[in-house]
Curated annotation (Swiss-Prot):
<dbReference type="InterPro" id="IPR004029">
    <property type="entry name" value="UreE_N"/>
</dbReference>
<comment type="similarity">
    <text>Belongs to the UreE family.</text>
</comment>
<keyword id="KW-0996">Nickel insertion</keyword>
<dbReference type="GO" id="GO:0065003">
    <property type="term" value="P:protein-containing complex assembly"/>
</dbReference>
<protein>
    <recommendedName>
        <fullName>Urease accessory protein UreE</fullName>
    </recommendedName>
</protein>
<dbReference type="GO" id="GO:0051082">
    <property type="term" value="F:unfolded protein binding"/>
</dbReference>
<dbReference type="InterPro" id="IPR012406">
    <property type="entry name" value="UreE"/>
</dbReference>
<keyword id="KW-0963">Cytoplasm</keyword>
<dbReference type="GO" id="GO:0006457">
    <property type="term" value="P:protein folding"/>
</dbReference>
<dbReference type="InterPro" id="IPR007864">
    <property type="entry name" value="UreE_C_dom"/>
</dbReference>
<dbReference type="InterPro" id="IPR036118">
    <property type="entry name" value="UreE_N_sf"/>
</dbReference>
<comment type="function">
    <text>Involved in urease metallocenter assembly. Binds nickel. Probably functions as a nickel donor during metallocenter assembly.</text>
</comment>
<dbReference type="Pfam" id="PF02814">
    <property type="entry name" value="UreE_N"/>
</dbReference>
<dbReference type="Pfam" id="PF05194">
    <property type="entry name" value="UreE_C"/>
</dbReference>
<feature type="region of interest" description="Disordered">
    <location>
        <begin position="143"/>
        <end position="181"/>
    </location>
</feature>
<keyword id="KW-0533">Nickel</keyword>
<keyword id="KW-0143">Chaperone</keyword>
Amino acid sequence: MLELTKRITHVDASEIHDNLVLPYELRIRGRLRATTETNLDVGLFLDRGPVLRDGDLLEAKSGEIIRIRAAEEPVVTARVETGLPLARLCYHLGNRHVSLQIGSGGAIGEDDRMGWVRFPPDHVLEELAERLGATVVHHTATFDPEPGAYNQAGQGHSHGHSHGHSHNHDHEHSHGHKHAH
């Protein structure tokens, strides 16, 4: 088994040994066993960090370079006018903490005034998108959602404020008595 242990950024295309095609649900994992396009058995042994994106490169302990490819998988694409309608759709879907891929236009001949939001099939989200004026289509496509504002390599999840870290302290609440923690 080829052990993939390192994320790398740039190599010459001729240095790429093979492709590893994975659906989104597997690209969020740092540890897994899989098979490449040429049936090479590989194991991912990556530190926690960003989701593997289509085109990302991994290096094996033995030096081989493997390119990540997003697999085609069942998705829903909701098409709506760009501008406020697209912003409204993104806001309401994002408010449900679902992974979203966002784009505009599309295939040759499609209206550039249309935007789209792609997400995993979910009847509640689909109904919401339709109520917000989107046309919903079930199909198979690659799913490469937005990484999110807090998803940066080597950093944990944060909400822009701190709660501190303490296990043993006393504090007083406005109701006049203390609690030991």
